[in-house]
């Protein structure tokens, strides 16, 4: 009979097969009441599942991250229960867990409205209050098919067809409603009280716009009402910081239907963009990169040789001319190999670091586009390092150091680093993978910072390092990457003359720090709520006169600051000074300079910040020196 080993090493023996819940009951009533599911020998199971052999067991409760996922998945099923009660003709599709929530795709003959969402949420709350048990039944495949056929759930039947090897399937019953799932799920609806439906959108069956359109209901669920309230508050703050809203408020950019996924940069936004580009250009030059420029439109022959045509063609914009097929480049890598291939390269030429602010275009689905965060036309701070295998560790270590410095300059210091290792389907010998993963791991260790493995998440040809930033709202943004690639040099016949006078393939390290400029600027807008640090602000200082008598000195102050390399503007409108101050505060200009008669006499400016802090009156030269200090600190000003 089973002996159960618990996480603390203690053991409990039973004289009969025992469920996860029964083990929890043997430990204590409090734990039993909180039990959602279990992990038996590392595998998640339902609380009702029976253990009949010796095993390790971890009880999963709402306090566990895995517990939250189970709550959210069960809430998705609860959406199905409520929808089928309110709209019996609706057909249920899929309801997975996503980051901080869940959704359910539903086929129905009309779009859901906000009133529908409110009704569904109300019915879900009523069902939760019934505290009914969720019943699991492992059911033979034929019976599952017959059940869903009798209920007219055609999408469930299609999903079953996708799993030909499954002989039995888990059915989860919410009273009269039933759904198919691997589980686990909550044992009772009392665990689902802290939920909220958040929005409705359209979706396509299997994510393909050629298929029928579905309605997608999004929601979130948490362990308790306190966590839910904190999440709602965070989402409300995120909405206030939405880069699309602030982009319009600060006149940074716009998007329009005639160019979906393409950004129209306005002067203010283009200023921010140029500051980023000039900064990255300087950083890369100081770290041994040489800048190149490659064509936007390239013959399909190159994309076929690189492998992109067979694997990525549907995401490429194509055109034809004079009986030749071309593609607008979706990435820069094959073109950089062409530059490397010009002229004979020696081991003495390596490492060669080619950088490009490369404009790329990808035919993203229209439903996936999101402001400037997810676009079709974008520019990357892209670079490729061609090096020997022995140079990989140092190049990776230098890149990690550089990347963390850049993020700190933008005000990001909470960085997660992950090493994605060999997937099941891969090319190359085990020895090559060992060396590649070892070099990247050693480089990460040299940083002195914590990092973690992502087993099996590497590309089929090599491991990679990923950098994820956490912003002021606690959201994670995956930005930087370093990808080890011996494959593309092989496909595109890149080589160098080694010390032994034989030709060898270089290792190619694909790397980016910001990712796309568009997405990174969107992140900065939301992180700072539009209140950019002085070095990034489109206008760093605005000079305002009180009356026309101070206009000449105001113009002189503007000219002096601009000639000193700052971005200053003058506001000479015949408006009250309070009105001007309020307007430029709303425009989030870092420094507001007021000039009255006394300032003209003393050739000074009265300085206040956009936060309303009065810095007093000071000579213009002194203000310029202080502004220079703020600019020099970049985004580190709040971190020191």
UniProtKB/Swiss-Prot annotation:
Q: Which SUPFAM superfamilies match?
A: Class II aaRS ABD-related, Class II aaRS and biotin synthetases, TGS-like, ThrRS/AlaRS common domain
Q: What cofactor does this one take?
A: Zn(2+)
The UniProt catalytic activity note for this protein reads: tRNA(Thr) + L-threonine + ATP = L-threonyl-tRNA(Thr) + AMP + diphosphate + H(+)
Protein localization: Cytoplasm
Enumerate the residues binding Zn(2+). 333, 384, 510
Matching Pfam families: HGTP_anticodon (PF03129), TGS (PF02824), tRNA-synt_2b (PF00587), tRNA_SAD (PF07973)
Q: How, per the record, is the cofactor bound?
A: Binds 1 zinc ion per subunit.
Q: Please state which protein family the record places this protein in.
A: Belongs to the class-II aminoacyl-tRNA synthetase family.
> Which HAMAP family does the annotation name?
Thr_tRNA_synth
Q: What biological function has been recorded for the protein in this entry?
A: Catalyzes the attachment of threonine to tRNA(Thr) in a two-step reaction: L-threonine is first activated by ATP to form Thr-AMP and then transferred to the acceptor end of tRNA(Thr). Also edits incorrectly charged L-seryl-tRNA(Thr).
Query: What is this protein's record name?
Result: Threonine--tRNA ligase
**Taxonomic source organism:** Ectopseudomonas mendocina (strain ymp)
């Amino acid at each position: 009979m089973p002996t159960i080993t618990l996480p603390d090493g203690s053991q409990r023996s039973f004289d009969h097969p025992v469920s996860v819940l029964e083990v929890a009951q043997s430990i204590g009533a409090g734990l039993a009441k909180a039990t959602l599911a279990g992990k038996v020998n590392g595998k998640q199971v339902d609380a009702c599942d029976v253990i009949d052999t010796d095993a390790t067991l971890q009880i999963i409760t709402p306090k566990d991250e895995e517990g939250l996922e189970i709550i959210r998945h069960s809430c998705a099923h609860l959406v199905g229960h409520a929808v089928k009660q309110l709209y019996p003709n609706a057909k249920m599709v899929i309801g997975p867990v996503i980051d901080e929530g869940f959704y359910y795709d539903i086929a129905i003959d009309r779009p859901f409205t906000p009133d529908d969402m409110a009704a569904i949420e109300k019915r879900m709350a009523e069902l939760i209050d019934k505290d009914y048990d969720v019943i699991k039944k492992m059911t033979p495949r034929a019976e599952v098919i017959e059940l869903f056929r009798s209920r007219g759930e055609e999408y469930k039947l299609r999903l079953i067809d996708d799993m030909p090897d499954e002989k039995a399937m888990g059915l989860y019953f919410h009273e009269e409603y039933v759904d198919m799932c691997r589980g686990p799920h909550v044992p009772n609806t009392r665990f689902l009280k802290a939920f909220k439906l958040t929005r409705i959108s359209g979706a396509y069956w299997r994510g393909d716009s050629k298929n029928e359109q579905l309605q997608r209901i999004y929601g979130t669920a948490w362990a308790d009402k306190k966590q839910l309230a904190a999440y709602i508050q965070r989402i409300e703050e995120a909405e206030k910081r939405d880069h699309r809203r602030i982009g319009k408020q600060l006149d940074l950019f716009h998007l329009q239907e005639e160019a979906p996924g393409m950004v129209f940069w306005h002067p203010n936004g283009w200023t921010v963009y140029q500051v980023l580009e000039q900064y990255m250009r300087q950083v890369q030059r100081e770290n041994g990169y040489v800048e190149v420029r490659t064509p936007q439109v390239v013959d399909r022959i190159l994309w076929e040789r690189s492998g992109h045509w067979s694997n990525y063609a549907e995401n490429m914009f194509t055109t034809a001319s004079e009986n030749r097929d071309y593609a607008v480049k979706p990435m820069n890598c094959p073109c950089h190999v062409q530059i490397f291939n010009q002229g004979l390269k020696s081991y003495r030429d390596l490492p060669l670091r080619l950088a490009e602010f490369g404009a790329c275009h990808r035919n993203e689905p229209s439903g996936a586009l999101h402001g400037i965060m997810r676009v079709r036309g974008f520019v990357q701070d892209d670079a490729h390092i061609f090096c020997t295998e022995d140079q990989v560790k140092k190049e990776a270590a230098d890149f990690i150091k550089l990347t963390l410095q850049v993020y700190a300059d933008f005000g990001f210091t909470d960085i997660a680093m992950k090493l994605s290792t060999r997937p099941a389907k891969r090319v190359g010998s085990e020895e090559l993978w060992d060396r590649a993963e070892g070099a990247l791991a050693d480089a990460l260790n040299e940083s002195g910072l914590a990092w973690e493995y992502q087993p099996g998440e590497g590309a089929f040809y090599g491991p990679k390092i990923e950098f994820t930033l956490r912003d002021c709202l606690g959201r994670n943004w995956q930005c930087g990457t370093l990808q080890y690639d011996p494959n593309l040099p092989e496909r595109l016949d890149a080589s160098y003359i080694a010390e032994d006078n034989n030709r060898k393939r270089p290792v190619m390290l694909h790397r980016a720090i910001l990712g796309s400029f568009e997405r990174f600027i969107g992140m900065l807008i939301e992180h700072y709520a539009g209140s950019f640090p002085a070095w990034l602000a489109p206008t760093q200082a605005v000079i305002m006169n009180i009356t026309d008598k101070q206009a000449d000195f105001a113009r002189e102050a503007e000219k002096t600051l601009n000639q000193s390399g700052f971005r200053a503007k003058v506001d000479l409108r015949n408006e009250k000074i309070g009105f001007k101050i309020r307007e430029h505060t709303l425009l989030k200009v870092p420094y507001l300079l007021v000039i009255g008669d006394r300032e003209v006499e003393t050739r000074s400016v009265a300085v206040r910040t956009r936060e309303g802090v009065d810095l007093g009156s000071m000579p213009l030269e002194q203000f310029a020196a202080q502004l220079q200090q703020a600019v020099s600190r970049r985004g580190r000003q709040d971190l020191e």
